[in-house]
Amino acid sequence: METNVVLAVLFWGCLLLGMPEGRGQEAEWRKGTYSDGTLRYEGYFRAGKPAGEMKRYYPDGKLQARMVYRGDTVEAVLYSRKSDCSMRGKYVVRNKQGTWEYFKNDCLLMKEEYRDQVLNGKTVRFFSTGNPAEEKDWVNGKPEGEWKLY
């Protein structure tokens, strides 16, 4: 009897962990298409809203964005049409939040800090070698302090 209870608990735990956000609510896998039938997006939805991983595609079929939805937070990786990573960061209630990184050909170009969609913190631009090219601090969207050029 104890073995059956343990197996049942493990089984249900695995099922819940396998669901997006692990809340036990039913999630539906959906795909959307452009008017020509090309895949536009694919991902899980719960109560009509994205939940868990979602991918968006350009009309030519290349990956445009990979996002992971958790409540009001979205971790996003956005790609250029060339399919190299262009930017990576987090949205909270549709506002940029925290560190955002910008790339070109897999080379880090810049890091910025956001609070509620507004620059707050340090912005660092990089040379193609990876060394800092410039640094600037921001408070509520306005530059503050020294602007360091290297």
Regions found by a protein language model. Give the residues of each.
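N-terminal secretory signal peptides that target proteins for export/translocation
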Residues: 1-3
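Bacterial N-terminal signal peptides
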Residues: 7-18
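Glycine/tyrosine- and acidic-biased, solvent-exposed loop/turn segments at the edges of beta-strands
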Residues: 18-150
